C-alpha cells in the first residue's frame, strides 16, 4: 500500500514545475533557498577509491545535511542524498564542508524527480554549533551500536529490563508523569526555576520544560539501567537511573529533542528490519532522529521547539483518554509541588482546556494555586541535618545506597501542614514524600513529611531494614516537636498536628520503622519546651497543669494555680485544651473539681478575689459551683460556701459562719 502511494506521488511530481518541486524540497528538508533557488547544505568530502568509466579520478559529498545538522533523505524512499564532484585537493584538509546545491536539470531527473547537484564550487566551513551536533549524533549512534552488541547480551539486557519494568510500573498508570517531573526538577538552568508543560495532541503526549538541555551524561544515563548521573549529585532528588523507563509502559515510540540532541526510542523503527523485538532492548537503543522527519503534529508544534527539553510519547488512540484521566487525576491534587526544588509552574494543555498550577511563598505560607485561585496553603519548614559518623560508616558497604548519600555530611527533612483561616487542617493518613509522593501512608500522620528516604526502585515504597531510613525516622520523631514549637506563635491549633498516640509498631514490615520514631519522639516530648503558656514563653509538658474544671476561666490562671499551690503553668488561652486528652499527654497533670474544691476552702487569696470581683464574675462562680454539685462533693461544697463572704453589710463582707457568730453575740 505504501509502495503504491510512493509510486503515485513520484509520477505526480514528474509533472510539476521546477519551482514547485523546489518549494516542496525546501519545506521537506527545512531549508530556505535564496532568490536563485540555491540551497545551502553541508556534506562530507570523499575521494573515490576507483576511477569513473572514462578512467578519471572523481569525488563525492556524502552524509549531506541541512545547516541544522539533519541528514537529508530524498522523499518517497529514494534514499540518502549524495552529490558527485571533481577531485579537489584543498577539500581533503577536512571532512565537512558547507556547499551550495540546486535542483538538477529535468533531463537528469527522470527516475528521481528530486535529484540535486552542486550549484558552484564555493565551499565554506561549517558552524561550531553544527560540529557539536555531529558529536552528539556520533554519541547516539555509538550507544545504539554498543547496546546489546551480541545476541546473548541483547537477550540478557531485555530480560533484566522487563523484570524491572514489570516490578516497577505494572500498577502505576500515572507514575511516568512523576518520573518526568523529577527529571525536570533535577535539570534547572543555573539560577532559574523550571516550568513544565504537558500537551495532549491527537496522537502524542508532549512533556516540555525550560530547564537545562541534555548533556552527554544525561543521555548515557537514560540509555542505561541504573547508571544514573544523579547517584553522585546531592542536589538532585533522583538516583535510581531507571525512572525514565516508565514512559515505555504506555508508549513504544518516544522522541527526545534537547539542545543539539534529537533521538528516539522506537520499537517499530525500520532499522530493526524483521528482527524479533522480544530480544532487542529497544528502550535503551537511541536512534538519531532528523527533526524534519518528526511526526507531523509534533513537527508543527511551536511550543515543542521553543522549550529547552521536549519529550514526545506516541499514544494509541484507544489510550488517549487514559492519559488524559491520569494527568487530570494528578492535577486534581497538586500538592506534589510542595517539595520539588525547582519546578514551580506546571501546565496541562488538552487543546480546548488548559489547567495551570503553581506555587509561591507569602511570608511563612506556601500557596499552591490552580488556574490563578488558591488551591491550598501550607506551613513548611526545612531542617538541615548533620549525618553522624556512625551512620555514614554504616552506609559505605550498602550497594543500594547512592554515592551521593555515602559522601554526604548533611541531609534535609521537611515538614508541611495544611492551613485554612489560620487553623491546622488535619490530613487523613498522608503519604510520605521523597520530594514526590510515595505510596506509604501506614503511619497515619496528619501532616506531610519529606526526606531523602531510600526507596524501592518504583519510588513508591521504603526500604524497611535500611539503617538510613531508621536514622531518618529517629530524626523525624525528634524534629516533629521542634517544628510544632516553631508554629506555636502563628498557629493557635499547632498541637493538633501531633499524633494522638505513639505509632503502632511491628517487628517486620513498614511499621518496624515506628520503633525508631517513637523512641525519639517520646524523648523530645518530655525534654523539649513546646507548650506555650504566654506570648513569650513555652515550657515542657511536665511544667503544665490542665484545668479540667473550667474554674481558671472565671478566677484567672494565677489565682487558680495559687489555690493549687502549684508552680506549674496553665497552657495559653488560645490552645484548645481538648488536645491534652490525647494519649501522648497522659503524663500531664490534670486537675479535677474533686481536687480543687477542697483546696479553695479557707484560701485567703480566693476569698479576697471573691470580695473584690464584680457581680458578673460572682454569678459565674455560683453557676460553676452549682454545676459541680454531686453527692461525693456536696460536703466540700457546703463547707466552701459556709466560709465564703457572701453577705455584705456596707463595705464589709461576711461568711455565713461569721454572720451567725456576730448575731449570737
Predicted stretch roles:
Residues 1, 77-80, 124-139, 145-149, ...:
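GHKL/Bergerat-fold ATPase module
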Residues 8-11, 15, 23-56:
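Structural detector for short beta-strands of small beta-barrel domains
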Residues 59-65:
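Short, acidic/hydrophobic/Gly-rich beta-strand patch recurrent on exposed beta strands
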Residues 68-91:
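Beta-strand/loop nucleic-acid-binding surfaces
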Residues 104-126:
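OB-fold/S1-family single-stranded nucleic acid-binding modules
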Residues 149-179:
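Conserved short strand/loop->alpha-helix "switch" segment adjacent to the catalytic nucleotide/phosphoryl-transfer site
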Residues 168-196, 243-250:
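Conserved ATP-binding N-box helix of the HATPase_c
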Residues 207-267, 271-273:
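Flexible ATP-lid and adjacent glycine-rich G1/G2 motifs of the Bergerat
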